[in-house]
């Protein structure tokens, strides 16, 4: 598995809320090939985006979708950077899938 983590600093809390809303609505179709997508608010103006793919090639193919998202939220953003690499470890508790914030897709 291959993981890409984006960290985004927004111009305001409202900008972050708008960008996260756009991501929730579009990420599954934009990040083609993603096996797992997660966002985390790291402050009132920043968020971390995690995307897990089967391979580095799948992650690279999804860069088109990442660019679409960056283009859409461009005026909302102060700074963006990302890290990526092979997944070393993952654990998923069976109760996790029942959490209210989880959206199951196909």
What is each PLM-predicted segment?
Residues 1-48, 54-68, 75-106:
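Short S/T/G/P-rich N-terminal loop/turn motif that feeds into the first structured element of a domain
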């Amino acid at each position: 598995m291959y993981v890409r983590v984006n960290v985004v600093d927004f111009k305001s809390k409202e900008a972050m809320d708008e960008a996260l809303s756009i991501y929730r609505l579009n990420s599954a179709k934009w990040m083609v090939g993603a096996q797992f997508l997660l966002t985390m608010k790291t402050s009132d103006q920043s968020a971390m985006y995690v995307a897990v793919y089967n391979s580095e090639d799948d992650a690279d193919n999804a860069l088109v979708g990442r660019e679409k998202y960056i283009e859409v939220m461009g005026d909302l953003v102060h700074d963006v950077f990302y890290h990526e690499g092979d997944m070393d470890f993952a654990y998923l508790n069976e109760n996790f899938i029942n959490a209210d914030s989880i959206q199951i897709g196909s």
